[in-house]
């Protein structure tokens, strides 16, 4: 293992991350909100740590090996979440313990959107901005790692996706080099953020709210600058804008690149994963609207329509915004929505969950097993986009699903052991493992009431979900650490 190469990259990451503390610092100084000193100290600590890692190995030229890539990907979130917690920890308002600060930081960077904070409307403006910025930075990291780095390690949904689907994204790389790929993705991500912010602003949000919510919308994060989330604005137009951008952000960013290059919007509909993604959103929305209408949950049909559509898209894409308390919805709707987050969005997007592409392959494998029972001697290939999928890919999908299920059960049992009720335990793990945010029971609105051990368990859940299980678990095997 190239330890020096890993240390150098960690040092560079921390040094770059320290510069992201300057915007909230400037906002604090301008607004005199009392958080200037925490951000100054946080900046100096993070910069010093980055230089401390980088300086002794600055002259080493060895390239990281494949094995090092796994460690670097995990450290990306572990280290940044740790140092990202410092401003929360040092802040007087809000006053946060270590578990709370790390939880909030991890939730931001993994774009989970679960929060331990209450009274957001009264918090310092710099802290509010910092939370939103954490999600935006985390979202960009997710895209670059998912599309450019993880496939080289043989992990992640995009590895399955681009290797098997013909058409606009069949190439092994978007552009010849990772650096160029990252740059292309950066422009798309930045462009979507600017477009989203402008749309929010034109719809009536303040400039601060528009920028902050564009950060968490495009990142599919779910953090808001208000306790009532998007419901604070009470605007169908703003809700509609959020729905559009949540769907766009839930689609494979490599596909966005291909659409821009080909200048053909129909490219989206030619993609099997996108078709299933949109079909699932439509189907669940119809079910939700029927149940809400029959139960007379809202007196106004327009309110039924907007709340129903918004919450389905928000939860199914794992964003986690709310316009209403969906946990109070009738019948099976709350459970259905929470379970929908386990599927999530498309591979190569900022969405959480298992990803649509894996769900498609699991369904096709199930269909094949049934057909095989009827025709035992037949050779029935699984096809995606008209092209056979190798058995190794199917095995990888089932391996992921098995580990995902096992991790879910273990984490849920661990949460139950902390003393929370079953609904809270299972929904909290579901929400954090799928990077959703809001759950049911005691975590329907926030996670402030969860004990310190429970918060650490959920931090692991968030990290495990964001790293798509394999990346983190591979570090726990003795084989990985042998020379």
Give residue ranges: language-model regions.
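Membrane-proximal intracellular helices of multi-pass ion channels
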Residues: 1-483
């Amino acid at each position: 293992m190239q330890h020096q190469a890993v240390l150098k990259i960690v040092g560079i990451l921390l040094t770059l991350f320290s510069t992201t503390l300057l915007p909230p610092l400037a906002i604090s100084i301008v607004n005199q909100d009392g958080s200037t000193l925490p951000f100054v100290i946080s900046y100096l600590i993070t910069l010093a740590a980055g230089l401390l890692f980088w300086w002794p190995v600055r002259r080493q030229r060895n390239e990281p090996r494949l094995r090092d890539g796994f460690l670097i990907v995990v450290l990306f979130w572990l280290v940044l979440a740790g140092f990202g917690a410092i401003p929360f920890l040092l802040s007087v308002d809000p006053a946060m313990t270590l578990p709370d600060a790390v939880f909030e930081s991890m939730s931001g960077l993994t774009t989970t959107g679960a929060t331990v904070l209450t009274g957001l409307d009264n918090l310092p403006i710099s802290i509010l901005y910092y939370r939103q910025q954490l999600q935006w930075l985390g979202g960009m990291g997710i895209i670059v790692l998912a599309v450019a780095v993880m496939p080289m390690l043989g992990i992640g949904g995009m590895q399955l996706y681009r290797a098997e689907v013909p058409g606009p994204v069949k190439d092994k790389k978007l552009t010849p080099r990772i650096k160029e790929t990252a740059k292309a993705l950066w422009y798309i991500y930045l462009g979507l953020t600017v477009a989203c912010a402008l749309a929010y602003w034109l719809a009536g949000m303040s400039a601060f709210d528009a920028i902050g919510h564009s950060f968490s919308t495009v990142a599919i994060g779910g953090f808001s600058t208000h306790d009532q989330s998007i419901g604070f604005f009470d605007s169908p137009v703003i809700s509609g804008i959020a729905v559009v951008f949540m769907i766009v952000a839930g689609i494979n960013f490599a596909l966005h690149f291909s659409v821009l290059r080909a200048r053909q919007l129909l490219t989206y509909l030619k993609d099997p994963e996108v078709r299933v993604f949109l079909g699932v959103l439509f189907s669940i929305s119809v079910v939700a609207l029927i149940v809400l209408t029959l139960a007379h949950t809202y007196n106004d049909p327009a309110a039924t329509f907007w709340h129903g559509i918004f919450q389905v898209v928000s939860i199914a894409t794992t964003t986690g915004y709310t316009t209403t308390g969906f946990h109070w919805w009738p019948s099976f709707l709350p459970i259905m929505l929470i379970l929908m987050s386990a599927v999530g969005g498309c591979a190569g997007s900022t969405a959480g969950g298992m990803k649509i592409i894996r769900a498609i392959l699991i369904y096709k494998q199930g269909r094949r097993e049934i057909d095989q029972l009827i025709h035992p001697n037949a050779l029935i290939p699984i096809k995606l986009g008209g092209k056979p999928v190798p058995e190794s890919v199917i095995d990888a999908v089932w391996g992921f699903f098995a580990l995902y299920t096992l991790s879910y059960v273990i984490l849920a049992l661990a949460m139950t052991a902390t003393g929370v009720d079953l609904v809270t335990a299972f929904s909290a793990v579901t929400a954090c493992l799928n990077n959703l945010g809001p759950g049911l029971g005691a975590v329907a609105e926030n996670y402030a009431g969860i004990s310190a051990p429970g918060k650490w368990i959920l931090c692991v859940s968030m990290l495990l979900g964001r790293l798509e299980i394999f990346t983190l678990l591979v570090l726990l095997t003795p084989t990985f650490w042998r020379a």
